[in-house]
Amino acid sequence: MSIDMDYMAGEEFITAEELGQELAAFFGLSAGDTVPERVSEQVVVFGGVFEPVGFLVFHIVRKGGMYPGVYESAILKRDFPYEQSVSFRLDKERNIPETLNVVLRFVCHLFRKYPVNALLEVLDRDECLFEKESGKICLRPGSDCFSPETLRACGIEALRAGAGEH
């Protein structure tokens, strides 16, 4: 069994090769450890390497693909159109709270290096909003899936109820 997390970006921001390099650098791996297995033009899978952490990474370009490219966002209270997503499949047999925090730290690293308007959807209920112009990362009110230490380390602020509507 698994849980999926999706980092959905309003524009294409990273190639599969760049994502492999970022995974290697962030997790201290050699470049050979992050060679993707291409599934199609729109899905690139990086897997197996992250077994100790407990997740697989999917680099998915959904533009023109089988997905609509629109996410119904609770934090924005409207649809969020996206061009690209990086998806994480977490193994439920592992330490899910720890894995969620590791993935959030990696996504924040990606955002700092490749700023883009984006949403991170977690467990079908929690969302983080990434704002390109301001550089802010905001967490949906009432979210409880990340540790306070990770939120502080990533510079994430919790939105007040009703905030985030654009």
Name each model feature, range by range:
Residues 11, 15, 52, 102, ...:
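Non-membrane alpha-helical secondary structure
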Residues 23, 58, 86-88, 103, ...:
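Hydrophobic beta-strand residues in large extracellular and virion-surface proteins
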Residues 29-97:
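Short, intrinsically disordered low-complexity segments
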Residues 8-11, 15-17, 21, 96-116:
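Charged, amphipathic alpha-helical segments and their flanking helix caps
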Residues 8, 87-89, 121:
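Residues in well-ordered beta-strands of folded domains
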Residues 1-41, 45-47, 163-166:
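Short, extreme N-terminal segment that most often corresponds to the first beta-strand
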